[in-house]
Amino acid sequence: MKIAVLSRNPRLYSTRRLVEAGIERGHEMVVIDTLRAYMNIASHKPQIHYRGKPLEGFDAVIPRIGASVTFYGCAVLRQFEMMGVFPLNESVAIARSRDKLRSLQLLSRRGIGLPVTGFAHSPDDIPDLIQMVNGAPLVIKVLEGTQGIGVVLCETATAAESVIEAFMGLKQDIMVQEYIKEAGGADIRCFVVGDKVIASMKRQAKPGEFRSNLHRGGSASLIKITPEERMTALRAAKVMGLSVAGVDILRSNHGPLVMEVNSSPGLEGIEVTTSKDVAGMIIGYLEKNSGPHMTRTKGKG
């Protein structure tokens, strides 16, 4: 197969591994800098050009679209879909999962376990918003943040009020969530490919920190997940419409709670921790499932 990898940086671990895994299995792998591709939208034959030439003959496309380029990245991916190229994850699913609020609303509607969550812009009764999520301690998040940036733990209601007021002054939409103390600063990253959790790891925040993101100095270790956690991860990925996803779960006193569903999960942490060939499994999924015009939205955007 001829497989495109949409990635701003061919040297990133995840991009490198996907290219290696594809070549090992005999495929032609082409890395395309998402922002440098440009499109002919309104022609009878949709096209993408890159470095002055049309991109043609691709069987599949692997989107590795960073959060900051979601809008343009999804547009390029959608154009591939219009051309009948099979996407590892569809543009609509990526856009859906990048909107944290929409994700939680969809997961909640399907009855998937979530921390109690409030959402506000300029609340006229801040103490009521704080009570809505069972009071302090609580976590406040800016909607656009990634890798644990824009996430604040407030130990008291007074601190929470100050932080909410500060974000209001910045005209930011904010998410207020109950703090799951029993998780002890740890979460579980379940790596979903197709209808299986192919690998999972526990991420533990460094001492004095509550954010377990590896980018924030958290450490990763092997973990055996429960059948309920496995089911939760698979259902969450399915609700988002993602074929490949990193589902972040907290262990709480009332079962597994989904924190986030990541449409472009990093491979380094999970491969190094579990010694599994995750990149190879992703290519294997494409081998089994890809075909022209096989998107669930049938390439109609």
Swiss-Prot record:
The gene is rimK. Signal peptide: none annotated. Keywords: ATP-binding, Ligase, Magnesium, Manganese, Metal-binding, Nucleotide-binding, Protein biosynthesis. Its cofactor is Mg(2+); Mn(2+). Mn(2+) 2 binds at residues 260, 262. Mg(2+) 2 binds at residues 260, 262. Belongs to the RimK family. This is Probable alpha-L-glutamate ligase. Transmembrane segments: none annotated. SUPFAM superfamilies: Glutathione synthetase ATP-binding domain-like. Pfam families: RimK, Rimk_N. It is an enzyme of class 6 (ligase). Mg(2+) 1 binds at residues 248, 260. One of its GO terms (molecular function) is ribosomal S6-glutamic acid ligase activity. One of its GO terms (biological process) is translation. It comes from Pseudomonas syringae pv. syringae (strain B728a). Mn(2+) 1 binds at residues 248, 260. InterPro entries: ATP-grasp, ATP-grasp_RimK-type, ATP_grasp_subdomain_1, RimK, Rimk_N, Rp_bS6_RimK/Lys_biosynth_LsyX. Binds 2 magnesium or manganese ions per subunit. Residues 104-287 form the ATP-grasp domain. The keyword Ligase applies. It comes from the Bacteria.
